Regions:
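Long, compositionally biased stretches enriched for glycine and/or charged residues
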Residues: 32-302
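Rossmann-like NAD(P)H-binding beta-loop-alpha module
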Residues: 8-36, 54
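An acidic- and aromatic-residue-enriched active-site/binding cleft used to recognize and process polar
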Residues: 7-8, 46
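Short, small-residue-biased leader/transition segments that mark boundaries at the very start
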Residues: 1-6
């Protein structure tokens, strides 16, 4: 998804800007992802489940300079979300969605107290936007206000667990989807190289996963298309979670394609955030009751 690709690029940009501000990285780097070979991001994992493990500038990994400084770690959003102690222990900067895995009990407790689940909030907000858009000449302004509210409340319950900090103004900027989409199109159409973190077929980039699995890794994009760059090995602490989550994704696909309750049960019962087979079974029954076309989820022989 383009929004998430943009966020990986933004994470690297924030880290590099932080190091430049502290005099720990060159100040004359120009555009971060212009494909000139000066900057290489070491990132590997799956969509919503990856770790930034290195940030090479002119052949030198500058990420250890960040990891030595708790004050620098907690100067940007992901660092505040996870805390300097955990980031230093991991030796990598996690994707923000890993908060649900590292702090699952805490996040669940806060989510249960929330006025509404995130999905319900977004559905209501979007419906309100469409209704109001029919009665205003400033649709662009209305959308910007809607988008800003969405960004301001993004991962609000997770931030509550981590100290209730507010998002920085720079993290609220728009342009995620379009910037990445245009960067890819520009690189291909004009044969102007760019380095981006993209979701592509694995093809041995991560040897623990099947070749056909979709992974999130650094790529070079140019007039000849998309090319995987050398991908850092998954950290030891990450390998099990990634392999397990990919198994869940594959069984979910099996369930949908083959209309199989068995595959769906395997998927849900092996998901790290589902703590009981009984819970998985109840979820499947609830899905079957709530959505048309999922009746097969109640067929124990499917």
């Amino acid at each position: 998804p383009l929004r998430d690709v943009y966020k990986r690029q933004s994470l690297a940009r924030r880290i590099l800007t932080t190091l430049q501000g502290a005099g720990l990285a060159p100040a004359d780097l120009g555009s971060l992802f212009n494909g000139d070979g000066r900057i290489h991001i070491g990132y590997s994992g799956l969509n919503h489940l990856g770790w930034l493990t290195s940030l090479n500038v002119d052949g030198v990994d500058v990420l250890p300079r960040l990891l030595e400084r708790p004050d620098l770690i907690e100067s940007f959003e992901e660092g505040r979300l996870f805390g300097a102690d955990l980031v230093q222990a991991l030796g990598a900067v996690p994707n923000e969605y890993l908060h649900y895995y590292y702090y699952s009990r805490d996040d669940l407790a806060v989510d249960r107290k929330a006025e509404a689940p995130r999905g319900a909030f977004l559905e209501a907000q979007q419906n309100q936007f469409y209704t109001q858009a029919q009665h205003t000449d400033d649709v662009a302004g209305l959308w910007e206000a809607t988008r800003l509210e969405r960004e301001e409340t993004y991962m609000a319950t997770n931030r509550e667990v981590s100290g209730e900090f507010e998002r920085d103004e720079a993290d609220l900027e728009t342009g995620g989807y379009d910037k990445v989409a245009l960067a890819i199109m520009h690189a291909i159409a004009n044969d102007v190289p760019a380095e981006l973190i993209l979701n592509v077929a694995n093809h041995r980039a991560l040897p623990d996963l099947p070749d056909e699995a979709v992974v999130e890794v650094p790529c070079r994009v140019d007039g000849a298309g998309i090319h995987r760059l050398p991908t850092p090995a998954l950290p030891d602490h990450a390998r099990g979670l990634v392999v397990n989550t990919k198994y869940v994704e594959q069984r979910t696909i099996d369930a949908a394609v083959n209309r199989s309750r068995t595959a769906a049960l395997l998927a849900l019962s092996h998901h790290p955030l589902v703590d009981s087979v009984h819970v998985a079974e109840q979820l499947l029954d609830d899905f079957a009751d709530a959505f048309d076309g999922l009746e097969y989820l109640k067929d124990a022989h499917a």
